[in-house]
């Protein structure tokens, strides 16, 4: 195995673990709501503080990596996330859970910008978009496997033991990844600080309007995804679902999402970025609205198709970021891009939780599905710049 593939494999392993941590929350939220007597707003706040912690640390992580290297930060962040979930397994109140999830989210904030930077550097002269697509797919594998495994384990060993077991696995991965990256000399060397005419606050963005356009679609896309996934389990419970069935439902969504990232990436090569984004966003909004009216079994049947559209847009957007940012500021650029997206993911569950408390989960999800269509005029507005970025 050559160095580039080894770096990609390491980044994929980290992505698998962190997305597993992030998305077991969708299984645990209904369990916590029942055990701690939570309102929908409180449920949304749990998701919000985790994603908010991720968002808060992504730009600092990109800056700090320039001083200490990606490898150390990735290992430390993975360990911090795992320890946050270990602590969650011992929590006995809503406030304790909030604290644990904030800590876990902060640790997970290093993963996206630094792993993406490592992969981009390893494939600087190679098939970077394909490598980043593979990296994104590994996260979807974590989304498919880990929530399903935890959902199956909860009725047998309880949610605390299930969470602690996966957290122990995360700690082991943190150690292994650090050793592997050091062996590969990836993210270890810290470039000497050479002051030039460039300001230290220069983010290296080549095309500000193009970057803003990508980020705006990312914000809407991510808020749709997190809002939908947070309250999908409650919609399914209202239709008669069990905890185990929720795990299967999430697995279906994430499996569709994994396919969607590959399928939509290929579709973008054939149809272009603009047309692909329009197709995926229209399909996402339409499928969410249809889902509300279906009984449980038909709802489960359409979830993989919904997953394809729900995750498909991201594969089109991520590969373009590196084209809009200079190579020496790439960790910063990814940090900004992911911060905006994760920030939207953080805010959406709490907002839709308030809507759910006021008017019910179906109303909140109807709003989620409708807001997706706001991407259409935005996409048409930036047609020329996105087309140039994708060229």
What are these regions (language model features)?
Residues 23, 51-59, 144, 254-262, ...:
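Residue-level signature of mid-helix packing/kink "hotspots" within the transmembrane helices
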Residues 72-86, 275-289:
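Structural signature of the two symmetry-related core transmembrane helices
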Residues 37, 69, 90-95, 272, ...:
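Helix-breaking motifs and short loop linkers at transmembrane-helix boundaries and internal kinks
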């Amino acid at each position: 195995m050559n160095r580039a593939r080894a770096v990609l494999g390491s980044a994929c392993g980290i992505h698998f673990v962190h997305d597993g941590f992030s998305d077991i929350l969708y299984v645990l939220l209904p369990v916590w709501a029942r055990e701690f007597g939570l309102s929908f707003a409180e449920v949304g706040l749990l998701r919000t503080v985790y994603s908010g912690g991720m968002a808060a640390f992504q730009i600092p992580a990109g800056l700090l990596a320039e001083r200490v290297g990606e490898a150390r930060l990735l290992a430390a962040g993975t360990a911090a996330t795992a320890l946050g979930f270990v602590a969650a397994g011992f929590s006995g109140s809503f406030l304790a859970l909030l604290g644990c999830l904030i800590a876990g989210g902060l640790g997970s904030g290093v993963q996206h910008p630094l792993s993406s930077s490592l992969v981009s550097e390893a494939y600087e002269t190679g098939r970077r978009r394909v490598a980043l697509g593979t990296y994104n797919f590994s996260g979807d594998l974590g989304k498919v496997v880990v929530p399903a495994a935890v959902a199956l384990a909860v009725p047998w060993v309880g949610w605390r033991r299930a969470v602690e077991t996966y957290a122990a696995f995360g700690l082991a991965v943190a150690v292994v990844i650090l050793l592997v990256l050091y062996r590969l000399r990836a993210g270890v060397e810290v470039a000497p600080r050479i002051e030039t005419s460039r300001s230290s606050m220069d983010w290296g963005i080549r095309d500000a309007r193009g970057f803003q356009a990508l980020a705006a679609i990312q914000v809407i896309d991510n808020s749709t995804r997190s809002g939908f996934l947070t309250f999908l389990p409650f919609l399914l419970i209202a239709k008669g679902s069990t905890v185990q069935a929720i795990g299967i439902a999430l697995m279906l969504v994430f499996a569709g999402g994994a396919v969607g990232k590959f399928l939509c990436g290929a579709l973008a090569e054939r149809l272009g970025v603009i047309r692909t984004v329009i197709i995926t966003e229209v399909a996402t909004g339409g499928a969410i609205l249809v889902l509300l009216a279906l009984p449980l079994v038909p709802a489960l049947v359409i979830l993989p198709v919904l997953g394809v559209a729900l995750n498909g847009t991201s594969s089109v957007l991520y590969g373009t970021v590196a084209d809009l940012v200079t190579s020496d500021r790439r960790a910063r650029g990814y940090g900004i891009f992911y911060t905006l997206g994760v920030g939207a993911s953080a805010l959406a569950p709490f907002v839709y939780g308030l809507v759910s408390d006021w008017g019910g989960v179906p109303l909140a999800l109807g709003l989620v599905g409708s807001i997706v269509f706001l991407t259409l005029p935005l996409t048409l507005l930036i047609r020329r710049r996105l087309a140039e970025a994708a060229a």
